[in-house]
Amino acid sequence: YIILPTERPPLYARTCSFSCVRAYGLEIKASGKINIGVFSDKNPFGYVDENGEYQGYDIYFANRLGKDLGVEINYVSTEAANRVEYLETGKVDIILANFTVTEERAEKVDFALPYMNVALGVVSPDSNVITSLDNWKAENKMIVISGTTAELYLTKNYPDIKLQKYDSYATAKSAIENGNGVAWANDNTEVIAFAKQNKGYTVGIDSLGSQDTIAPAVSKGNETLLNWINDEIKTLGKENFFHADYDATLTDTYGADYKETLVVEGGEVKKS
C-alpha cells in the first residue's frame, strides 16, 4: 500500500520503514536514526556492560522501538536531572530512563502510556536499618539523586530531613557505601536491586508515598511521536512483551516474585 503524508500505517505493519516514520511527521534525522536518552549506570534498567553495549529493561524496550520504527538507535547517556532538559533542547527524541510520571514533569514533557509500576524505597546498612522516617535524627543525612522523584517527595513531605544530593546513580551508590549518609532513598526497584547486588544492606522501607508509574517521555507537543509510542505499547501488550522483557532483564535480580507487581502490560495499570 502507499502511505500518504497524513496517513498513519496500520498497526499490523510491525516493521516501519523510514518513509513510514516520516508519514508520522516525526522529526528524525534523514540518516534514519532516533536519539533515545537512557541511563548508562543503572543495572538492571539501563547500563553499559563489559563489552560496551547498552543493556537492561529500558534498553530491551528501546531496541524494539527502533526495530519497529525501522531506524538505528543512537543511545544518549543521561542523568536523572538532565532528562527533561534533553527533551526540551532536542538532544533526544525519547527518554527511556526509569522516568516516573509526575504532575510537575508532565507540565514540561509529554508522557506516553506506562510500562512499569514503581514506588519509593529506602535502603540502609544492616548495622542501622531505617524502617521509618517519622523519628529521623536531625544530624542524619539521606542520600538522594538530584532530579529524582525521591528528592521531590522528601523535600515536600519531609522538609526537616537533610538531603545529601548526588548527580548520578554511581556517585550515590559510592556515597552509601562510604557512609556519607545513613540511608539512600530512590525508586524501590532500584534500592531493592542495590540490596540484592550488594551484601550488607537492607531495604527497610519498600513502599514510601504513592504508587506511581514509569513511562516513555517525549518533548511537549510532539503528538505524532507520542501517539506512535502509545499505539506501540498497546500492540506489544498483546504479545506480553513486557513480561518477556522482565524475564530477559530483571529475573536475575528480582526473581519471579516481583513480575506481576512491577510489569504494566499494554499501558493498562491493574487495580490492586
Q: What do the predicted segments below correspond to?
A:
Residues R22-A23, T149-Y166, V203-S207, I233-S272:
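Ligand-binding clefts/hinges and TM-proximal coupling segments of bilobed small-molecule sensing domains
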Residues M116-D126, N188, I192-I233, D252-K271:
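Periplasmic-binding protein-like
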Residues E85, F99-E107, K156, E177-Q211:
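A ligand-binding cleft/hinge motif common to bilobed small-molecule-binding domains
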Residues F45-Y60, L133-N135, T261-S272:
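Short, solvent-exposed loop/beta-turn-alpha elements that line the ligand-binding surface or hinge
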Residues S124-M142:
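Flexible hinge/capping segments at coil-to-helix
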Residues N74-E85, S146, Q164-N178:
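Short helix-initiation/N-cap motifs at beta->coil->alpha
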Residues A23-N98:
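Extracytoplasmic small-molecule ligand-binding "clamshell" domains
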Residues V48-D49, A62-V71, A150-D167, A195-K196, ...:
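Ligand-binding cleft/hinge of the Venus flytrap
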